[in-house]
Structure formats: C-alpha cells, structure tokens
Amino acid sequence: MLIKKPADIRTSEITSQDNYLNRRAFIRAGSIAGASMLAGPAFSAMVPDKRRAKLAGVSSSDFSTDEAANSYEDITTYNNYYEFGTAKDDPYHNATDFESRPWSVTVDGHADKTGTFHFEDFIKPFDLEERIYRMRCVEAWSMVIPWVGISLADVVKHYQPTSQAKYVAFETLHDPVRMSGQRRRVLDWPYREGLTIAEATNPLAILAVGVYGETLPNQNGAPIRLVVPWKYGFKGIKGIVRISFVDKKPRTSWNMATPREYGFYANVNPEVSHPRWSQARERRIGAGLFTPKQATLMYNGYGEQVAHLYDGLDLHKNF
C-alpha cells in the first residue's frame, strides 16, 4: 500500500544546538540566579560532553514533521530512562560517565542471518537519515526531536526473518554497576519491548543513533535506541543490546509491571485515557508555563502512515 508522507521541514528552520547553547550562555551570564529559580534544572550549565561527534553522510527525510524542534537542552535534560534514575534530570546527571563504547548488538531468533555484531558493523550497511518526529510521552507531555537513525525496516530485511517470525523483541543492556537505576527493582530488568513485524517494517520506525546531527547522548539511549513516533515514548527502548525475531508476542517491561495501565501496542490515542489521567491533551516541553495544553492527535498525527496496521483491532481493548 502507498505510504503518504508528511510535509518536509528544512534543517535551516531548526534552531541549531550551537546557536541555542550560545544564547543560553548569554542569558545565564546576565541572570542565572533569577532564571534558575524560575525554570529549575533546565537552566543549569550543561556539562560539555567530549564524546559528542558529528555524524557524516546524514540525508534529510520526507517523513519529517513541519513543526519546530525542541532545543538540544530540552531533549537532553528532560528524559525518562529509569536505568539511570526516575527523576526527569536523573539520566542527564547519572549517565555522564557511562561508556557506550565498545558496544555490541546480538540478533537472534527466527532469521536467516543471526550473530553478535560490533555497533559500528551493525549500522554500517544502512543509510543515516534525519527524522524530525513528534514524541508523545504516556505522561501527557511531548517534544519534537530531530533524530538521526537507520530504517528499522531495512534492518529487518537485512537479517531475513523467516515466516515463523511474527514479532520483533528488543532488550536493553543489564549492568547495575554502570546503570545505577537498575540497582532498584523499579522494573523487572533488563528493559524489554516489542513490535509486530508489520510495525517494525513500517517506514516510520527507526533505530536512532543520533540527535541534532551528532551521536546520541547517553541520557537519550546511546548508542542505539528505538523510535516509533506513533506510539507512547516508553516503547522507545534505549541502549539496545539484543534484537530477536520471535513467533509469540514478547513480554514488555511496563506491561509486565502494570498491565492495567500499559498495553503492548501503546499507540497514542486521545480517546483512551490512562487509568489515572486523560490522554486527550498534552503539554509541549519548552512552550512556557502559561502556554495552554494542546490537543493530542490520534497516532500522534501519523495516522495516514500507520492506521492500516490496526484495521479490525479494538483499540480500547488493545491499548
């Protein structure tokens, strides 16, 4: 079936991270004390990360949204990554010394090609693209993020799953020594997620390896994470070390922890409330304290590309 593409956005229309950080430094120099009281941790000086590196050969994508992206600071200091703590700024502070190299990814299960691959070898066969996507958290906040990544559909095709493979399962690194949040039993570690084969081969799904044209920061899931923009953010598993082609629906971390609150599909749906809050509206991070919440779009606005995946499925039961 023909996949319709959303409107493109020129890279020049996004505030560059250098310009943003230079502007932030100027503001801090003049009024850091007052700003800190008003805005909290996001206004604290960002620690330079010497491991940041520009990514070469990145092409633009017709799948990018026409909305302006959040700042680099928004994206890298306001995160859910429970492997490094449960507060929004915990990953930024606690992942600072995490070493994401060397890294390997294991591909196994019902596929003709399997094995364990160095990260660099794993991504080498695939083209890098910038995908500027909306990201909607299940907690009713959102961002727009300029990811750099590789097509998950291309990855699936490369490893040639057999007809037995109905789902793709993902697993995060389990290392409580280096990932301090894993020392607490917040979840049944390691973090696990999954998609149907049809979802994994949809053109919107990517494995992200960067943001704002640079390598992915630790707090955002370095060196490789899943991005499925029509689903709630918790589906975007970070720090991936295993990809498995399986014949049965994989168990997923939040669904195992609280099945009444977090389903397997986790499609953004303003008509299906979380048991403890409405999903009809969302707060855009960085929009300002007095900016009204905005209406949440079905499938986060990507319905033209993905709605057909769920034809005949009761979305109230299969949330």
Question: How would you name each of these model-derived features?
Answer:
Residues 46-319:
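Structured, non-membrane catalytic/scaffold regions adjacent to prosthetic-group chemistry
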Residues 31:
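Short, locally clustered residues in the helix-turn-helix/winged-helix DNA-binding domain
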Residues 42-44:
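Boundary at the C-terminal end of the N-terminal hydrophobic targeting segment
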